[in-house]
């Protein structure tokens, strides 16, 4: 059995009769992109800007190919990531040692304590919590996610009226959903759930980068509606993946993440074959379906095709996604 099929088999249960129709991937991607940048899908049906769009994509390709030009699209990966991840991947890590490292960052400390307080609130424990105990309460996976959220969130922040700024909130919202789903799917495939979480969170850095690249081409005067065209969106997605690979790969976040960045950057998310790549691709689909679900409708059984085939942890992850 091919590797991709084996991975899928680990995540899916026995097939059941379809009850929810699914848009073809190009249609879903188009609708999702319109949601991402705040353009009504029906408004994006106008003819594209022709030669200008071709020039825009060509100049984005020049940015992708230039290490110097790429460098300005995203902040550099903070040095704290490799050090903390190395500590957390060691099963012998001391909660006191980790707490000492975390205490040097006020924002990270607040995030860890907030997560631990949330966990304790579900039970009867009303004891006051300090940082060392918070580290013990949320465990390794909780720590990894808290660190990733705090350290990586600034990558997605943007202000102003640019294309990347108007999409920033949606990009982060989708990244958080995709990270949670990818963690669940990766765990079902026998992978470290955190590798899935990190993959889901960081893949959307490609969206931020490609939209910032487009923002830099102000002289072309091409607006969101022209870019959100059925013929153009697939080209933007391909460049999103290329930038993800080119920017995240050098951060050296671990062997699997390095290989994923190279794979996605080379062949695109739709064509990946590695187990982690397949987990990310499936999470990307589910997160997009969640974004496009009717307002107030969070039931996967009513909005996700082949819902009953998903493993229970994946269903639970989907059900726990925020609005």
PLM region spans:
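Conserved alpha-helical "signature site"
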Residues: 1-202, 207-216, 227-323
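Catalytic or ion-translocation cores adjacent to nucleophile or general acid/base/metal-coordination motifs
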Residues: 220-222
């Amino acid at each position: 059995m091919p590797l991709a099929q084996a991975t899928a088999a680990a995540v899916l249960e026995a097939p059941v009769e379809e009850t929810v129709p699914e848009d073809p991937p190009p249609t879903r991607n188009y609708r999702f992109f319109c949601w991402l940048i705040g353009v009504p899908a029906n408004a994006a049906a106008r003819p594209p800007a022709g030669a200008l769009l071709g020039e825009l994509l060509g100049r984005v390709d020049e940015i992708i190919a230039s290490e110097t030009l790429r460098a300005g699209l995203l902040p550099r990966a903070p040095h704290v990531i490799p050090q903390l991840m190395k500590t957390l991947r060691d099963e012998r890590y001391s909660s006191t040692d980790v707490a000492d490292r975390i205490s040097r960052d006020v924002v990270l400390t607040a995030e860890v304590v907030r997560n631990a307080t949330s966990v304790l609130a579900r039970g009867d424990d009303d004891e006051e919590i300090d940082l060392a105990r918070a580290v013990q309460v949320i465990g390794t996976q909780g720590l990894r996610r808290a660190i990733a959220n705090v350290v990586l969130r600034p990558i997605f922040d943007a202000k102003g009226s640019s294309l990347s700024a108007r999409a920033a909130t949606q990009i982060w919202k989708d990244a958080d959903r995709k990270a949670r789903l990818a963690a669940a799917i990766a765990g079902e495939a026998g992978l470290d759930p955190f590798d899935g979480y990190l993959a889901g969170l960081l893949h959307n850095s490609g969206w931020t980068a490609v939209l910032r690249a487009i923002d830099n081409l102000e002289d072309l005067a091409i607006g969101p509606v022209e870019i959100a065209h059925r013929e153009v969106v697939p080209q933007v997605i391909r460049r999103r993946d290329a930038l993800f690979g080119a920017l995240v790969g050098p951060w050296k976040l671990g062997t699997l993440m390095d290989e994923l960045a190279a794979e996605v950057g080379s062949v695109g998310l739709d064509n990946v074959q590695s187990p982690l790549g397949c987990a990310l691709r499936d999470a990307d689909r589910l997160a997009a379906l969640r974004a496009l679900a009717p307002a107030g409708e969070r039931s996967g059984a009513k909005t996700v095709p082949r819902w009953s085939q998903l493993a229970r942890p994946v269903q639970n992850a989907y059900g726990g996604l925020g609005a």
